[in-house]
């Protein structure tokens, strides 16, 4: 991010303050998942300022990130600013940020292989037979799944420990290790 652009956006912090807060969060909560949404192509954004944004993304290594091309909203200060950027340039900049994030995500996903994660079961995928689960870091309908194979049935709304065997850009794949809570349908069952 760039201090001039942050100021023009009427943000109350600067790059150094943001990096400081992010550093404190990571020191205090080592397994924290950091997510953000960015805007590329804000009015007046120069190539150098855009490079600052790209470098910020590379430095911070967000766990989840979305980047959108700036779009003028009617009756806003930004819509009346000089230096409106061509839509094609804005789209290309947003795409470049997402390409950087794709590389970061691939590394972060691959690093989870071999780890045990706690997941919440959302249900089963009828096509693959795998259980669709998510970690505490995953937003439903936004983030990927932890696709779980299990010798025992898993129940929606219940938590399980899963060994991550594989990953792709968005999803993790694993095997259920521990059945941590009984099914609400059968409180006497033993798994």
Cite the ranges covered by each PLM segment.
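Conserved non-cysteine loop/helix-boundary elements of the Radical SAM core domain that shape
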Residues: 1-64, 70-89
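Single conserved hydrophobic/aromatic residue that forms the stacking wall/gate
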Residues: 179-191
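Glycine-centered loop/turn positions within well-structured domains
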Residues: 3-4, 170, 187
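Terminal RNA-binding accessory module
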Residues: 69, 80-181
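Secondary-structure boundary/capping residues
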Residues: 34, 106, 110, 189-190
């Amino acid at each position: 991010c760039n201090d001039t652009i942050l100021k023009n956006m009427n943000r109350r912090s600067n790059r150094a303050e943001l990096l400081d807060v992010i550093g404190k969060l990571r020191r205090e909560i080592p397994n924290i998942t950091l997510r953000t949404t960015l805007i590329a192509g804000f009015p007046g954004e120069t190539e150098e300022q855009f490079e600052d944004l790209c470098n910020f993304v590379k430095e911070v290594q967000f766990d989840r990130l979305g980047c959108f091309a700036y779009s003028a909203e009617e009756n806003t200060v930004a819509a009346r600013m000089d230096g409106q950027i061509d839509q094609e340039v804005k789209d290309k900049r947003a795409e470049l940020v997402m390409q950087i994030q794709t590389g970061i995500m691939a590394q972060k996903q691959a690093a989870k292989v071999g780890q045990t994660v706690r997941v919440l079961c959302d249900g089963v995928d009828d096509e693959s037979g795998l259980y669709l689960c998510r970690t505490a870091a995953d937003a439903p309908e936004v983030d990927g799944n932890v696709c779980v194979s299990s010798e025992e049935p898993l129940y929606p709304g219940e938590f399980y420990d899963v060994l991550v065997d594989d990953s792709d850009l968005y999803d993790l794949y694993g095997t259920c290790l521990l059945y941590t809570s009984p099914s609400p349908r059968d409180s006497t069952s033993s798994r």
